[in-house]
């Protein structure tokens, strides 16, 4: 059942929040096991996060979908690089930003593999859409509301696909 998998994903992603609340003691043993057993910073945890992103998008919660997607992209890229997704998070985000900035320089862009180019475009788009949403359009050249909702929905799906891809699958 998709809703059950999405609830499991929510439990995994929200572990720090869930564990800090007394409600965990009253939660079903099944929910408690989801929180205890899955590591959101693992490939299995990322597959659950991809499901959560899709569920949020399907319910029209595109801001939340984009937020989870952006964080999960950082985690997945850290794992792909063999880095610690928690300890090296800031450095990995900086690297993603550097890749996205490289799109502006033709010489840098020419050195990108197709996979790196797609990742740089995904990160750049996620960052721009997130900024448009979180800054309530108070930016130069913000997207229109209708276009922003469409873009956020499309990006959420692209990010979910990238996050959940197989290890041996290209970016």
For each predicted feature, which ranges?
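Long, low-complexity, Lys/Arg-enriched
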Residues: 1-171
């Amino acid at each position: 059942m998709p809703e059950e998998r999405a609830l499991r994903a929510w439990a995994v992603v929200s572990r720090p929040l869930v564990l800090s609340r007394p409600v965990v003691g009253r939660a079903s043993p099944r929910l408690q096991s989801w929180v205890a057993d899955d590591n959101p910073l693992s490939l299995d945890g990322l597959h659950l996060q991809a499901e959560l992103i899709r569920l949020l998008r399907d319910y029209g919660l595109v801001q939340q979908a984009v937020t989870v997607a952006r964080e999960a992209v950082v985690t997945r890229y850290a794992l792909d690089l063999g880095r610690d997704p928690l300890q090296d998070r800031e450095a990995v985000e900086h690297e993603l930003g550097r890749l996205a900035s490289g799109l502006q320089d033709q010489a840098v862009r020419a050195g990108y593999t197709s996979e790196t180019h797609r990742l740089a475009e995904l990160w750049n788009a996620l960052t721009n859409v997130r900024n448009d949403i979180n800054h309530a359009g108070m930016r130069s050249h913000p997207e229109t509301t209708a276009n922003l909702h469409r873009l956020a929905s499309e990006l959420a799906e692209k990010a979910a696909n990238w996050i959940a891809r197989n290890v041996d699958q290209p970016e």
